[in-house]
Amino acid sequence: MTEGGARGPAGPRGDTAAPAGRSSSLAPQADTLFAYGTLQFGPVLEELLGRVPEADLGVARDRRVAALPKRAYPGLVAEPGRMACGLVLQGLTPADWEIIDAFEDEQYELRSVRVMGWEEPVPTFVWTDVVAERDWHPEEFAADHLHGYTALCARWRAEFGRRTR
């Protein structure tokens, strides 16, 4: 989704780019987000947003969910012929976007991508730095990192709340 990094827990063609650094014009206008990484997990969303938004399955063509060096979370990159599976989170509020935007690592850029079954492009965070050759797998993340990552999210969210009061 997001997918949470240096500012959050650390452990393409055809896209509509939005400037990194954020609160871009894409986010306030959208109530959806294509989440392909850690933001697919209810416990992570619960810690960050205080709720789990409604979601539908989503697939972005010509994209790959890549593992990132020395990180538990992934990055979405362009790769012809591949398909990236995730969730389209729905009903996001401006307050949700503020949290998600602050949470995401600076190497992500908010862009709109085509998601199968969705008429309009859906915002997502694409990775702009080096990726591993291997794919990121949510089931591996769930087994190996979810518990600790969720605890990091809780600490990050508490600190974010103190900074934004």
Give a label for each model feature:
Residues T2-R165:
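Glycine-aromatic micro-motifs
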